Amino acid sequence: MFHDLYREDPLSLEEREAYERDLISFCDRELDLLGDIKGLAVLYAGGSSPLWLEGLSQRIGRTGTLVALEADTQLVKEGQDLLRDADLAAPVRLVAGDVFRPPLERNTFDLVYSSGLFHELDVRERSAPEALTALASVVRTSGRVGTSDFVDSVPAVQLEDEELQHELTRELSGAEFYGIDSPERLITLHEALLDKVRWRLSPPCPIRHLDRLILAEDEPEELRSLPMKARRNMIERREALQERIRYEGYTRLATLYVEGWVSR
């Protein structure tokens, strides 16, 4: 949903710790699929989350390097501040840039990795294959591209939540998202551009107390800028989603990891 909009933490200290442990566990599960990446030059594409960067840095170690590509310049600045307190092994460099036109030298990295990039990708002007091609261009020959993302292989409240977020953004900015779909769509995307593609589908990873955090959120301020009819529709859908969360909890989606090798 529209996360981090609640005024006060609705969780106790113990509940907050359990929630954060589950987030770390989910991150670790996804990063473990990369295998041994010690000493590699790695690009993390499409984000500046300290949780993911810290996990990658620790796996890469002091003999490797990590660059993170983030489109939002404000998030780059915030990420730089947060990383000062992170437990890093490999040095991390944050770069502002677009995955369609990464401001990086070609043939630079041993591995390009993304988590959640494609379902948030705005394909209004350029396509998902163009994004994957651009990312592969900065990988050395015989290097690897690996992506993790949500798929709709199991029913989940999260799917409705993500769709509602995307619709609000579309109403505000006109963005068109690649979105969440079947595992086959992502596998086919990678097979068209990479060699020796392999993949793994992982079951949903529950996050304790996530439902309570979402139910505690305030109404997004962005709703006020919508036309009255669109705003009313969005509020009604948000309320229906909240009722579903109260009844079902915040059930999460499965994730798909796909990787392939670059050859030229």
Residue locations for each model-derived region?
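Class I SAM-dependent methyltransferase Rossmann-like catalytic core
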Residues: 1-25
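Conserved alpha-helix/loop element of class I SAM-dependent methyltransferases that forms part
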Residues: 19-40, 55
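Class I SAM-dependent methyltransferase SAM/SAH-binding core
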Residues: 43-44, 48-101
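A short acidic, Gly/Pro-enriched loop at the edge of an enzyme's catalytic core
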Residues: 100-112
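A short, conserved alpha-helix within the catalytic core of class I
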Residues: 121-134
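Conserved class I S-adenosyl-L-methionine
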Residues: 146-168
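Short alpha-helix
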Residues: 178-193
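Conserved Class I S-adenosyl-L-methionine
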Residues: 196-264
